[in-house]
Amino acid sequence: MIFKKLFSKGSTSPTTRPRGATFSGTFPTDVLSDDGSGTNTNGLSNSTTNPSSIHSTPTTPTTTASTNLTNSNKLSTLAPITNGNRSLRGSKDGSGTTKESKKKVLTLNEKQKLLLKSMEYIKGSGTYYGNYMEFYEIPIQIYVGTEPSETYPSLSYNTELRSLILDFNKITEIPEQIGLLPNLKHLSLAANQLSQVPEFLSQLKSLESLELGINQFTSFPLNICKIKSLTLLRLETNNIKSLPDDFINLENLKDLSLLDNQLKEIPDSLPNNIEKLNLGCNDIINSYSKSLIRISHSLTTLNLSENKIEVLDESLSCLVNVKTLILDCNMIKVIPGSVLGSWKSLVTLNLPHNFISDLPAEIVTLDNLRIIDLRGNNFEFCKNYPSSESSSILFKIEEFIKDKEKLKSLILKENLEILSKLKDDNSTTTTTNINSNLDVPIIITTNIETIPTTSTTATTTETTNDITFKISDITEIIEKTDTTTTTTTTNQTDNVKLEEKVYEKQENDENNSVTLETTTTISIASDNTDEASIQIPQKEDGDKENLENDDKLLQESFSENNNNNNNEKQQEQQENPLKESQGKIQQLEEELEKLEQKQLELKDKIRLEKIKYQEIQQQSPRLSQQENNQEAIVVNTQPSSPPPTIIVNEQKSEKLENEKPTKREQPMVVVTKNNNKAEVEMTAPNQLIFWQSIVPDLIIDKLYLGCRECAMNKSWLKDNNVTHILTVANFKPLYPDLFKYLIINIDDVDEANIYQYFKEMNTFIDEGREKGGVLIHCRAGVSRSATATIAYIMMKNSVKFQEAFDITIKGRSRIYPNRGFLNQLKKFEKDLSK
């Protein structure tokens, strides 16, 4: 790996220039001066009169301190000092001629004085910002107050200051005077040149938040372990390899970020009450950790992205309270179902840019899951879809699951558990989300006693409580039954016995009747009705006594026959144990054969009903959310999910068939009252699935230009035979074992000298194209990487800047190199002509 560094880690980073509009056509020639200096004959810096397409030269930023400032945007670039309109070259008078505008040019000393004046601390302020000020030490002006210091006579205790933010400076140490800020709660010294934390910092008993990212720590600063009051600690982008044992003593710590360090494993000394843990961009290989098990009671957010994890250990099943799990850019091939199924609190699951080709069926049991990121994996069925398509419209989560049989089994189990709860509650109001992931709806009605056998869907005389789930679920009941019973739901337990005879094939529009224990029955319609359903209607009062007598006689007959058979079997068992065993085997084989035959018959019926249902569904769309006579009632089903809405429509079913569907933004329960019968339909909660991958643009043969995410998409890069990656930014290689990298550490600012790297980058690009292919990228794929691409085309094709620019923008229309880079490309054009 080749690594180039232009600025030291703690050097000042100038302000970010404004990003302009996309070029379309010839680049304006007046932007470039003949000598490449970026100035015109009028002595003013080059800029266009269109504010949306300027690249202004950064100026030193300023900031103010006031009591109403917050630390929510402390790392952002502050507003630069301006003097008039910097982008205006001249103004037109009434005659239409252009006059040069006068612009006062501040000297360096004047700028510094103005900055220092603007940074004067206002006595009594609770926050002080001093970002990008090139401070070499903490300014002493903040030590003002009513109580003078005995140790430092010229300074005073400042009891008002709560937040001190001095990011992106050149501070090398924390002074002892920091003790004069006894009520300081937030201290941020990110992007400085610190290498140690002094012990006296622990004297700040109110300090809760400490941010020391992007400094020069080669090991974890031990004195941090003595600051017991810390609740937030950030040490991103240092060279920390491990954590000390005493770190576990920070019992108040809830938010810890060790992003972009050199950790080889998940530390064992994590404090007990961590809620948010960021270990991304390290070198972690093993996902097993004792500390994760220990803190699982409090952990809600875990980031393990950009590591080298290949296997998710079974111990990760302890993450029962995690709501956000980030596993981007690892080497994961399989997600164990036993692990995934235990993440019941999960709301956001990020798995982009791994090697996953299948999701476990257990993912459908995660009721709180709302966002699933699957970009850049190996799901074959969606590779040919354009990335512009909406994933939430095209695909459902079930399509990413290969084990459909297990999927149906899990859905059935979940629905039966819900049905059992509804029976136990003996409620007439549906408040539970029924999983409706499969195709055909089934209606189950509770709170009734018996069921008549009919050839059509019965209409009850009283309002019933119908709950929709899918007909495919019933297949699993048949597959797992014996000759006499099958498992569903009862009032006392989770089992309901379905008698074998209900599954015998019926002809001539006869239905299969199933009698449930206690007061609930299920009827499976097997004729060619318009909609396959399982329904439990209320029986007529006139038939009640006769049906009860018939049931009693039938039960007595079964009981007598069973007793006789049991007595005979007991005698045979006592006489010949061997015969008993053989008989059991034969009996089980016969039962298995019958069940297999019944399973095939029912599967064939289900298949035909699904086809018919889909045809009917296309002709008559579902109930609209916003049509006539709606009455909405909010019912909470899950604590972390949006509440479903119940919409009651008292209207004829013929009218419902003609209504157009509307897009539903939340889970929905639709109750339709028609002829004194209530039908309830519950739609599954919406899930946002990201599957589209961002891919780079092909500029010329075997040369791709893109953003940083394109460099993350290793599956696409491997599929397109990319072997080399040129990174024109300060990003460490993501996959050094898969690709060869050249890192050019340079900022996207006008003053940066990218010209000096043209020769080295061109050689690397040539090598990559010879080996298979090369990707050139920066953060956005707009300025730095575009400049490198243009320079290579100028050299390789022996063309001028404008022609190389046109070739590049044709392949990637969003490119926009900054003004300084454009001037250097113009200079490169002159050098090539020599």
From Swiss-Prot:
Organism of provenance: Dictyostelium discoideum
PANTHER family per UniProt: DUAL SPECIFICITY PROTEIN PHOSPHATASE, MAP KINASE PHOSPHATASE WITH LEUCINE-RICH REPEATS PROTEIN 1-RELATED
SUPFAM superfamilies with a match to the protein in the record: (Phosphotyrosine protein) phosphatases II, L domain-like
Pfam annotation, one family: LRR_8
Region (Disordered): 1-103, 503-584
EC number of the protein: 3.1.3.16, 3.1.3.48
Polar residues compositional bias, start-end: 79-98, 511-536
Keyword Hydrolase: yes
PROSITE patterns: LRR (PS51450), TYR_PHOSPHATASE_1 (PS00383), TYR_PHOSPHATASE_2 (PS50056), TYR_PHOSPHATASE_DUAL (PS50054)
Biased composition (Low complexity): 36-78
GO cellular component: cytoplasm
Domain of life of the organism encoding this protein: Eukaryota
Placement of LRR repeats on the sequence: 160-181, 183-204, 206-226, 229-251, 252-273, 274-292, 298-319, 321-342, 345-366, 368-389
Coiled coil: 555-615
Gene Ontology biological process: aggregation involved in sorocarp development; cell motility; chemotaxis to cAMP; negative regulation of ERK1 and ERK2 cascade; negative regulation of MAPK cascade; regulation of adenylate cyclase-activating G protein-coupled receptor signaling pathway; signal transduction
Catalytic reactions on record: O-phospho-L-tyrosyl-[protein] + H2O = L-tyrosyl-[protein] + phosphate; O-phospho-L-seryl-[protein] + H2O = L-seryl-[protein] + phosphate; O-phospho-L-threonyl-[protein] + H2O = L-threonyl-[protein] + phosphate
Enzyme class, broadest EC rank: hydrolase
Encoding gene (name): mpl1
Domain Tyrosine-protein phosphatase, chain residue ranges per copy: 695-834
A GO term, aspect molecular function: protein tyrosine/serine/threonine phosphatase activity
Keywords: Chemotaxis, Coiled coil, Hydrolase, Leucine-rich repeat, Protein phosphatase, Repeat
Phenotype of the disrupted gene, per the record: Cells result in higher prestimulus and persistent stimulation erkB phosphorylation upon cAMP stimulation, display strong defects in motility, and more rapid cAMP production. Cells fail to display aggregates, fruiting bodies, fail to form territorial streams and are defective in cell migration (absence of random and directional migration) and in chemotaxis.
Keyword Transport belongs to the record: no
Active site annotation, chain numbering: 778
Function: Probable phosphatase with dual specificity toward Ser/Thr and Tyr-containing proteins. Dephosphorylates pNPP, in vitro. Essential for proper regulation of erkB (erk2) and optimal motility during development.
Residue stretches of biased makeup (Basic and acidic residues): 538-554, 569-582
CDD domains on file: DSP (cd14498)
Record protein name field: MAP kinase phosphatase with leucine-rich repeats protein 1
